[in-house]
Every structure is written in C-alpha cells, then in structure tokens.
Amino acid sequence: MNSDDKLFLLDAYALIYRAYYAFIKSPRINSKGFNTSAILGFVNTLEEVLKKENPTHIGVAFDPAGPTFRHEAYEQYKAQREETPEAIRLSVPIIKDIIRAYRIPILEVAGYEADDVIGTLATEAGQQGITTYMMTPDKDYGQLVSENVFMYRPKHTGGFEVMGIEQVKAKFDIQSTQQVIDMLGLMGDASDNIPGVPGIGEKTALALVQKFGSLQGVYEHLDDKAIKPKPVSYTHLTLPTN
C-alpha cells in the first residue's frame, strides 16, 4: 500500500443491524419465507461504497463468537442487550459468503471486537499516510479520527457523512478527538452497559472535559468546586500513569 491508496474498513454488524431495522416495518421476505432485509441492505451499502468511492483496498470486520477481553474485564459488558434477532443470525453466514464472492477479506480476531480490529488497522494505515475510512454509524469511532483517518457514517436520510477531525470536534464540542474517550469515560455508554461516574451525564461530562482538558485533568483537580458530585464518586477511575 502507498499514500495514493484509499482504504475502507466496514463494521459488519453495525451495518447489518442498521440494514435489518431499516426494513423493520416492511421486511423483505422472499418466496421461501426468509427475511432478506439484512442481506439486501448490507449488499446495497457495499455496492454503493464500491461504485461511489472505488476504494483500492477494503475489508469487512466481524465480531467473533464468544466473549472478548472486555467481557473478561467487566462481566456486565453489553449484558443488557437482547439476543440477536433470528433473521440476522441466519443472514450472517450468507452475507459472509457474499463478501467472499466479492473477494473482499473478512477480518475477525478471537477475543477482539470488530472496532478493535478496525481501530488497529486504521491507526496503522493512517500513520503510513494512507487515506482510511471507517464505515460505521457508531459514534465511538470518533476517537480514532486523525489527519488521514475518517469516519464514513451512513445518514438516516440516505447517503453518507464523512467526518474528519474538525467535524468530530464540532459534533462533540471538544478541542481534540482524543477527548471523545474522556467524555465517554465520564458519562459511560448505555448502549454497551458501561457505567460512567455516578451523577455525571453528557452535559456535565462535556463541561468537565472543556474545563480540565481530559479525564486525567479531572482526576488531578478533584478538589475543584466545579467537580460534582463529591470526589469519592471518582475513586473507581483507573487511569494510566507515566
């Protein structure tokens, strides 16, 4: 690969779920009674990317079966999520066969989620000067955006939204894409069943990050009157030390 290449990395399950629920009110049932909504939506999205963007390199990342290192670190990780709809479960093997027919690599690593794989590859490619697009509706990917790495988000109204550094900063009202990590660390992430600091929501998390710059900055100023609730609420934070 070289700096003239264009790499697309697709978050498979995020796009499959999105496709399935896009047709939830009018599912695409074939003559055999099989719900093809997820398959149709995913393939339409893939075709649109291939024709519109003409990437030189592309890969589709899947979550592996079984727990990941996050489940080992936090037993309740994603514990609140309902079981995968049967139509999606039955569609995934077919979607994988279709991806293989396109001769597109399937990226799947035991113990790691698709976003871990995408994040690693996107960061490495970006550091090599390769223009890289992470295709997902997941806001968490904002922390990975850099000079050469972009989010490629499907829009509810159709089409896609490309988000670079300035777009991510504007969306979250932050000064650095790295502050996405600090925001989520303080407020938690309900979609993944990850708790934040008790009593801290999105508005307070944003205010703290804007005032102190980072989660580490908050930790270093626990005696500041701007930090509420009481400092004891922050004692569960595990922060790296240099």
Which residues make up each language-model segment?
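Noncatalytic, basic helical substrate-engagement surface that gates or grips nucleic-acid strands
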Residues: 2-135, 139-162, 166
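Short, solvent-exposed helix-loop connector elements
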Residues: 27-31, 188-196, 226-234
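Generic structural signal for alpha-helix starts
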Residues: 85, 226-228, 240
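A short, charged helix-loop
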Residues: 162-189
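Helix-hairpin-helix
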Residues: 190-210
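Conserved small/polar residues in nucleotide/adenosyl-binding loops
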Residues: 235-241
